């Protein structure tokens, strides 16, 4: 009887997947596609966006219902979110899937994982929360709720290993999407800009609070750079219309005369086209490394937030390239260090045309390439294999 059940699971599993936002849905779509190669008859059910729906995942709830961002929005919708979370647990408990995969959204998914695991359902958390950086005691909650964590980055797995929590490093989907040698000519063509021109890309962040604190020093940096290097032009990708309006308002006050090329999105192409990039910390810094653009990371926040972060954050670096390299590969100019003068000083290392500057740039790009290779592992397939191994009892969580 047991072998009949095992064969049934192996050939025809029910796989529950919950994505809490657009980025999770993209990962979910790639994962389902890879899982279908292994399990053509599998049933996929959970909370899905357009990418997962395109791969025939049944969605029990519209993803828009839970895709809320920011503390104020979350508090505003908290009763509804808690009800949806309880309903999902109830529905999946009745369905009894062979495995549950929660993609990111830890506040939502770890609760679901904990409840389902207690019923004997195997659970995976895909995308590690930043437990290695702050609130490290969350590791115990993760250990209780999951059979396996899928991590994008090798230092994340090393952290879980320290606590004997099952974790598999699968590489990063972004490293799979960006070629090792990005095509600058193609990027310039896509942006409709002259490839013979020198550019600096400026990315002041995707959140309103980031643009609020960074737009002014970044614009002042561009003013100083223009005086020092008159041939430079500036590419400014903005994630949406709201951020564009916010940035334009700051520019009108701080640097009305400054000539900028404002872009709707196209951050990746801007970084590939640029001689150097000035950006906020976050996933953009990893993307910039993969685009092989020498960068300076700048970050400012409220004084109270910075005071708290200094006490909570346990890592030596804040940017992903430096965390990956485990060294100060790119400058991090935080809070009082994030001044136009200091940002210009650091960017000049990449923009000067001396022999040593050219050599430094080449060495940095080589290191970026090595780190790219480290995390370019075909993450979708690696994630699917990890799911299959747990599903078929080849690993124990």
Swiss-Prot record:
Function: Condensation of UDP-2,3-diacylglucosamine and 2,3-diacylglucosamine-1-phosphate to form lipid A disaccharide, a precursor of lipid A, a phosphorylated glycolipid that anchors the lipopolysaccharide to the outer membrane of the cell.
Family (UniProt): Belongs to the LpxB family.
Protein name in the entry: Lipid-A-disaccharide synthase
HAMAP family tied to this protein: LpxB (MF_00392)
Keyword Glycosyltransferase: yes
Key words of the record: Glycosyltransferase, Lipid A biosynthesis, Lipid biosynthesis, Lipid metabolism, Transferase
GO molecular function, one term: phospholipid binding
GO CC terms in record: membrane
Lineage: Bacteria, Pseudomonadati, Pseudomonadota, Gammaproteobacteria, Pasteurellales
SUPFAM superfamilies in the record: UDP-Glycosyltransferase/glycogen phosphorylase
Organism: Mannheimia succiniciproducens (strain KCTC 0769BP / MBEL55E)
Catalytic reactions of this protein: a lipid X + a UDP-2-N,3-O-bis[(3R)-3-hydroxyacyl]-alpha-D-glucosamine = a lipid A disaccharide + UDP + H(+)
Pathway involvement of the protein, from the record: Bacterial outer membrane biogenesis; LPS lipid A biosynthesis
E.C. no: 2.4.1.182
Gene Ontology BP annotations: lipid A biosynthetic process
Top-level division of the source organism's lineage: Bacteria
Transferase recorded as keyword: yes
């Amino acid at each position: 009887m047991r072998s009949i059940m095992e064969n049934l699971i192996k050939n025809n599993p029910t796989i529950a997947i919950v994505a809490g936002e657009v980025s999770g849905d993209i990962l979910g779509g790639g994962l389902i596609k890879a899982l279908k190669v292994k399990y053509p008859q599998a049933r996929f059910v959970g909370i899905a966006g357009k990418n997962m729906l395109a791969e025939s995942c049944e969605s029990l709830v519209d993803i828009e219902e839970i895709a809320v961002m920011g503390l104020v929005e979350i508090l505003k919708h908290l009763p509804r979110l808690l009800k949806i979370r309880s309903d999902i647990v109830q529905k999946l408990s009745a369905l009894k899937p062979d495995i549950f995969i929660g993609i990111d959204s830890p506040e939502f998914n770890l609760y679901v994982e904990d409840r389902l695991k207690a019923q004997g359902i195997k659970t995976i958390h895909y995308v590690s929360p930043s437990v290695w950086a702050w609130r490290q005691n969350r590791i115990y909650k993760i250990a209780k709720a999951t059979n396996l964590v899928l991590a994008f980055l090798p230092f994340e797995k090393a952290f879980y290993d320290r606590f004997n929590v099952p974790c598999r490093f699968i590489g990063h989907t972004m490293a799979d999407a960006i070629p090792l040698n990005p095509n600058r000519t193609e990027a310039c063509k896509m942006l409709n800009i002259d490839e013979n021109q020198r550019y600096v890309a400026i990315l002041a962040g995707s959140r309103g609070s980031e643009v609020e604190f960074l737009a002014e020093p970044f614009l002042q940096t561009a003013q100083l750079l223009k005086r020092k290097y008159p041939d430079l032009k500036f590419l400014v990708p903005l994630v949406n219309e709201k951020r564009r309006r916010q940035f334009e308002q700051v520019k009108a006050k701080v640097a009305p005369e400054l000539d900028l090329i404002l872009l709707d999105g196209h951050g990746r192409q801007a970084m590939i086209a640029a001689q150097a990039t000035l950006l906020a910390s976050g996933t953009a810094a990893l993307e910039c490394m993969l685009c092989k653009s020498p960068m300076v990371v700048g970050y400012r926040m409220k004084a109270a937030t910075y005071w708290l972060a200094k006490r909570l954050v346990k890592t030596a670096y804040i940017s992903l390239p430096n965390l990956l390299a485990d060294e100060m590969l790119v400058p991090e100019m935080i809070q009082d260090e994030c001044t136009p003068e200091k940002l210009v000083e650091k960017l000049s290392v990449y923009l000067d045309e001396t022999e040593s500057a050219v050599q430094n740039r080449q060495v940095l790009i080589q290191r970026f390439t090595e780190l790219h290779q480290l995390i370019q592992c075909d993450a979708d397939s690696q994630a699917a294999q990890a799911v299959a191994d747990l599903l078929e009892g080849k690993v124990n969580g």
